[in-house]
């Protein structure tokens, strides 16, 4: 029996179950959605094509092309599309383009979890290697687990991309910005991953941190572009704007494919 048959049989059994039947209050089928790739007219550029071919990717999705266009044109943007829709490409590709064009260009990646930073470091280094930019498109993690020796080394000679978290920006970068002068002078792109996690008291705190960050950048003559990624939420542009204090463009219409899905809602008669 194929997978669809297994799922249909499972749902029928669930609805017919003497114990669960009355608890199933809704069943809906979401049809599959094919991928929507960016048009052939999109100016990908030689570097992007090289990276995509090297990673076995045939084409960018429409939302990826839209996000990259905003970044290339110096516009702040938040991308709110489902998990595994390729948001990493949206900021890594323009960052690599900028480093190739100007090796002094710098980027700051902010992640709420250390595990995310580790994963993204590997992804960035792989793209840089495919692009032949491993020598210039360097990256390093700067967080609470970074040894004192390595921190001093990073401060003395910052890599092209620093991957850290908001707390480290607040406690270790901004108060000692004179030690990071070279980095801030050349900072062009600030990536805020999982921006939807910054809400409530934490969100209020981060709004102040981002404003301090922009003031420090302006002090050193830099005007970086914010690139935020978010899970699918109702108001990504409003949230990103409130956090950063700047006008943020929104990319929400995902071009990534989606398989057929069954949505089943239960209303349990008793608690756990």
Residue spans of the language-model regions?
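Helicase-associated low-complexity/disordered flanking segments
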Residues: 1-65, 75-76, 137
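Conserved helicase ATPase motor motifs in RecA-like P-loop NTPase domains
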Residues: 64, 80-85, 194-202, 210-239
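Walker A/P-loop NTP-binding motif
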Residues: 69-73, 88-103, 211-214
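Conserved Walker A/P-loop ATP-binding site and its immediately adjacent core
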Residues: 88-89, 105-126, 231-236
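Conserved SF1/SF2 helicase motif Ia
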Residues: 96-119, 135-136, 218-222
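Conserved helix-turn-beta segment of the N-terminal RecA-like "Helicase ATP-binding" lobe
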Residues: 116-143, 242-248
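Conserved helix/coil segment N-terminal to the catalytic DExD/H
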Residues: 144-188
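Conserved interdomain linker/interface between the two RecA-like ATPase lobes of SF2 helicase motors
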Residues: 225, 229, 233, 237-272
């Amino acid at each position: 029996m194929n997978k669809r048959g297994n799922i249909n049989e499972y749902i029928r059994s669930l609805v017919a179950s003497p114990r669960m039947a009355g608890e199933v209050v809704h069943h809906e089928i979401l049809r599959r959605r094919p991928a929507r790739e960016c048009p052939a007219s999109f100016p990908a550029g030689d570097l992007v094509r090289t990276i995509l071919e090297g990673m076995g990717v045939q084409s960018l999705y429409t939302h990826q092309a839209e996000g990259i266009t905003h970044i290339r044109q110096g516009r702040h943007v938040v991308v709110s599309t489902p998990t595994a829709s390729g948001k990493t490409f949206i900021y890594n590709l323009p960052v690599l383009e900028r480093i190739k064009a100007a090796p002094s260009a710098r980027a700051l990646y902010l992640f709420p979890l250390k595990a995310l930073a580790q994963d993204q470091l590997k992804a960035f280094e792989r793209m840089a290697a495919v692009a032949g930019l491993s020598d210039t498109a360097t990256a390093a993690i700067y967080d609470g687990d970074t040894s004192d020796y390595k921190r001093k080394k990073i401060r003395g000679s910052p890599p092209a991309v620093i991957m850290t978290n908001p707390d480290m920006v607040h406690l270790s970068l901004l108060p000692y910005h004179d030690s990071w002068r070279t980095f801030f002078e050349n900072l062009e792109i600030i990536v805020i991953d999982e921006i939807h996690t910054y809400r409530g008291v934490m969100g209020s705190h981060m709004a102040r941190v981002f404003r301090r960050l922009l003031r420090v950048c302006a002090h050193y003559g830099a005007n970086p572009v914010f690139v935020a990624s978010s899970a699918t939420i109702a108001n990504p542009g409003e949230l990103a704007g409130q956090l950063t204090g700047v006008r943020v463009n929104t990319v929400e219409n995902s071009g990534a494919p989606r398989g057929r899905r069954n949505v089943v809602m239960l209303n349990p008669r008793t608690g756990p």
